[in-house]
Amino acid sequence: MLHPASSRKLFSGSQSVAKVSVQWLLERPCFSLVTVETTELKLPSRVEAIEEAATAVAGFVNRSGISEEAAFGIDMAVREAIANAVIHGNKLDETKLVEVKVKSSPDSLEIKVHDQGQGFDPKNISDPTKEENILKSSGRGIFFMRNFMDEVDWSTAPEGGTSVRMIKRRVN
């Protein structure tokens, strides 16, 4: 068994070796250090949870270094996706959860929102820019998601529920 003083020396030596090893790797042309951060939220299907989850995601987005303008659009898209999951997907059934996963990488921000509802086909959603839909009080959420994000796609899980995946690429 190591004596505590010996283990401190061993640890500090290991730290130095690790720093040198990382530096050596970074100097190689085929290696780079990539930081990927993720966060996951699970929330009940209540209207109040939409604001709480959107605020948590906005904090993550702001810490990720996304521009203020992009962060505004991401916030709108996230709020709409979560609201759709809570209201339309899970139909405000508090026994059903909405899962939100956010992943920040050097080239993009990816957000997934999954509900436990029946699912739907986004192709069947009316175009909110058509004259007959302009004055409707709802129906713009998917339009906002598609316009504020670079990629938006939906999938239905075999066990039920709908997932929306939204990606915002970073501008270098």
Enumerate the language-model features and the residues they cover:
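Conserved beta-strand-loop-beta-strand hairpin that lines the nucleotide-binding pocket
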Residues: 2, 25-40, 86-172
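Extreme N-terminal basic, low-complexity initiation segments
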Residues: 2-9
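Cationic, low-complexity basic patches in intrinsically disordered or flexible, solvent-exposed regions
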Residues: 10, 16, 24-28
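STAS-typified acidic loop motif
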Residues: 40-51
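Conserved short strand/loop->alpha-helix "switch" segment adjacent to the catalytic nucleotide/phosphoryl-transfer site
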Residues: 55-79, 134-137
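Generic detector of N-terminal low-structure segments
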Residues: 13-14, 33
